[in-house]
Amino acid sequence: MSDASLTKINWQPTASIQTLLKRSKIMAEIRQFFTDRGVLEVETPALSEYSVTDVHLSTFSTEFLSPFAKQAKTLHLITSPEYHMKRLLAAGSSSIFQLCRVFRNEESGKRHNPEFTMLEWYRPHFDMYRLINEVDDLLQQILDCEPIESYSYQFVFQTYVGLDPLSASRAQLVEKARKHGFACEEDENRDTLLQFLFSEIVEANIGQERPTTVYHFPSSQAALAQISSEDHRVAERFEIYYKGLELANGFHELNDAKEQIRRFERDNQLREQMNLPPQPLDMRFLAALKAGIPNCSGVALGVDRLIMLALNANHIQEVMAFGVERA
């Protein structure tokens, strides 16, 4: 390779050094926020024996071959530290947080990079609303923004889509989705329709002036959240949006191992229907649930998007040392 060819290679970072200095200060401020509240910082593996069953997540995988092993072992880069952190909760860690790199084999663009930084924390004895208040405190401190406003999923869906997401027929959802450009079939999965309408219509109308929490997602979208004891049609799950970005996703955490197994198995059934490979269940995580995790709430927050908002950046790679195109 000649020296001339090297001069044509763009080796420079995607973020300016000035931006990286500001990023470092924000990361330190986040850590201080939790230190002041007595929350323990933890580190958990980036590689896991298990993938995830969620049909909306795709992992990066690699093969680990020990010098003494007869065959390679498949390992997956984590999409979230959730399962490992809940194992720490089961072991008695009390309140914990983590700043770590996570990996999703998906799109890359203005708001997405396949490798990004996640802030995740868990608060024993917090209900969903108390945790939302703590997220609000963090956002006001980092972004100097107005306090969060909160609405139920049902309310914002009815307001902007014009249908009740908890009672609308599949035919009504299909008709509305088609009007907004979704080429769906009559038997399209109900949650796929809800998620399309929410992302296409609702998200564009919320969180523009101040951070907005949407809570009580349909129970079919509970993921790892508990079902509401007051209304079994909805889950104790929330998401936070601000200025066109989904910032955080939180749960009043499910702590019933049998119910979690049922949900994982339903995920795998859906994966088969979508011609996706089913995934083995994370037995270590399920064993920890059976051993018992405390009643708690937890949330995952996209740090790069938070920094985008803090620094008025237009592209996620502007706040990363090296985006995927220059990794």
Swiss-Prot record:
Disulfide bond entries: none
Keywords, sorted A to Z: ATP-binding, Ligase, Nucleotide-binding
Any GO BP annotation: lysyl-tRNA aminoacylation
Pfam family, one: tRNA-synt_2
Group of enzyme by EC: ligase
EC number: 6.3.2.-
Sequence positions that bind substrate: S80, P81, E82, Y122, E253
UniProt-recorded Gene Ontology molecular function terms: acid-ammonia (or amide) ligase activity; ATP binding; lysine-tRNA ligase activity; tRNA binding
Gene3D superfamilies membership: Bira Bifunctional Protein, Domain 2
Residues binding ATP: R104, N105, E106, N113, E246, L247, G302
Matches recorded under SUPFAM superfamilies: Class II aaRS and biotin synthetases
The protein's role, per its UniProt record: With EpmB is involved in the beta-lysylation step of the post-translational modification of translation elongation factor P (EF-P). Catalyzes the ATP-dependent activation of (R)-beta-lysine produced by EpmB, forming a lysyl-adenylate, from which the beta-lysyl moiety is then transferred to the epsilon-amino group of a conserved specific lysine residue in EF-P.
PANTHER family listed in its UniProt record: ELONGATION FACTOR P--(R)-BETA-LYSINE LIGASE (PTHR42918:SF6), LYSYL-TRNA SYNTHETASE (PTHR42918)
Family per similarity comment: Belongs to the class-II aminoacyl-tRNA synthetase family. EpmA subfamily.
Subunit structure: Homodimer.
Name of the protein this chain belongs to: Elongation factor P--(R)-beta-lysine ligase
Gene that produces this protein: epmA
